[in-house]
């Protein structure tokens, strides 16, 4: 099982799906300054709680600043049992431009 890197256009279909959990792995200040609606800001401080309470069968869309760190985070989520994990190419920067 592995994650898939997807474009913003592909991600938009997931954003409309109620079974999608959106994870923002940027720092909390960047998250506060702007984020994808309905996203959850995940850090080392709350990752354990997120793993405990989140169903492994959801669609998990992970994003960061420009799409690099989200790949490592996506792999981490796969290793922790999530079945359908996506990393947003271009990250929040791409989302904010469009």
Question: What are these model-predicted stretches?
Answer:
Residues 1-20, 27-59, 65-98:
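Rhodanese-like catalytic fold shared by cysteine-dependent sulfurtransferases
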């Amino acid at each position: 099982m592995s994650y898939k890197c997807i474009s913003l256009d592909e991600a938009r279909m997931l954003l409309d799906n109620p079974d999608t959990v959106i994870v923002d792995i940027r720092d909390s200040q960047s998250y506060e300054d702007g984020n994808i609606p309905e996203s959850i800001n995940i850090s080392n401080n709350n990752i354990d709680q997120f793993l405990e309470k989140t169903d492994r069968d959801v669609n998990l869309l992970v994003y960061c600043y420009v799409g690099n760190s989200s790949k490592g985070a996506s792999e981490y989520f796969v290793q922790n049992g999530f079945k359908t994990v996506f990393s947003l190419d271009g990250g929040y920067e791409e989302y904010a431009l469009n």
